[in-house]
């Protein structure tokens, strides 16, 4: 989860988020090298006393500064497209959960079970217990099994919302009349926090998301107790 004065990303909890972090580092390295080269050239131009006003044509230079940026863009685009297609893949999910956005709470339905659904509201600050996080705790957490592919169906009952959990690399728009889907898989147990990431009204900041990823045996006990 996030912490005060954090500069980087949250710790990756899913394979997709790990890929996104690697892509971020890959792109940042390219940008850093280009920026260093440009800064070096600018420094040379500002400090040198030599002038060259007779150059009218430089085809070699023009060829290089056309081909080189194209190669750099390809090196950025290929891994980006790979991750984009990975995020859209939904292959034989073990569990499907339907998420509906409301002003201003989330409702969840485990579609593989006959009657397992609930609403998830933020716990007011006055009702928090010691150790709980302000504006992030909910009365009903979304309990899911870890190390299993889970499909999330996301939509909205009223206005635009966005269901986002940064440590899992998830951000899916909840659009009225449209059903979007995404997949998640956690590589470790724990509590993972998110929030609505689309301005949806006066209480937009009070729509937290809490996922509790647990081993399968604990999930089965929880689901049995909820039915």
Swiss-Prot record:
GO terms for molecular function: copper ion binding; cytochrome-c oxidase activity. The keyword Transmembrane helix applies. Its main location: mitochondrion. GO terms for biological process: ATP synthesis coupled electron transport. It is found in: Mitochondrion inner membrane. It comes from the Eukaryota. Keywords: Copper, Electron transport, Magnesium, Membrane, Metal-binding, Mitochondrion, Mitochondrion inner membrane, Respiratory chain, Translocase, Transmembrane, Transmembrane helix, Transport. Mg(2+) binds at residue 198. The keyword Membrane applies. It catalyses: 4 Fe(II)-[cytochrome c] + O2 + 8 H(+)(in) = 4 Fe(III)-[cytochrome c] + 2 H2O + 4 H(+)(out). GO terms for cellular component: mitochondrial inner membrane; respiratory chain complex IV. Residues 46-59 are mitochondrial matrix. The chain crosses the membrane at residues 15-45, 60-87. Belongs to the cytochrome c oxidase subunit 2 family. PANTHER family: CYTOCHROME C OXIDASE SUBUNIT 2, CYTOCHROME C OXIDASE, SUBUNIT II. This is Cytochrome c oxidase subunit 2. It comes from Balaenoptera musculus. The lineage of its organism: Eukaryota, Metazoa, Chordata, Craniata, Vertebrata. The gene is MT-CO2.
């Amino acid at each position: 989860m996030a912490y005060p004065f954090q500069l980087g990303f949250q710790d990756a909890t899913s394979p997709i988020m790990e890929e996104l972090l690697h892509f971020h580092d890959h792109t940042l390295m390219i940008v850093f090298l280009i920026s260093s080269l440009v800064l070096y050239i600018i420094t040379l131009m500002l400090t040198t006393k030599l002038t060259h006003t007779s150059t009218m044509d430089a085809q070699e230079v023009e060829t290089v500064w056309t081909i080189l940026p194209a190669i750099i863009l390809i090196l950025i685009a290929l891994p980006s497209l790979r991750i984009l297609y990975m995020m859209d893949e939904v292959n034989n999910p073990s569990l499907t959960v339907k998420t509906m956005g409301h002003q201003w709470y989330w409702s969840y339905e485990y579609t593989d079970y006959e009657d397992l659904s609930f609403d998830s509201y933020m716990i007011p600050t006055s009702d928090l217990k010691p150790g709980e996080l302000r504006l992030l705790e909910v009365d009903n957490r979304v309990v899911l099994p870890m190390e299993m592919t889970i499909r999330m169906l996301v939509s909205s009952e009223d206005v635009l919302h966005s269901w986002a959990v940064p440590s899992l690399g998830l951000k899916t728009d909840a659009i009225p009349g449209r059903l979007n889907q995404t997949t998640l898989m956690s590589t470790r147990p724990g509590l993972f926090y998110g929030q609505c990431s689309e301005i949806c009204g006066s209480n937009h900041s009070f729509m937290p998301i809490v996922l509790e990823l647990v081993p399968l045996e604990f999930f089965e006990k929880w689901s049995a107790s909820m039915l």
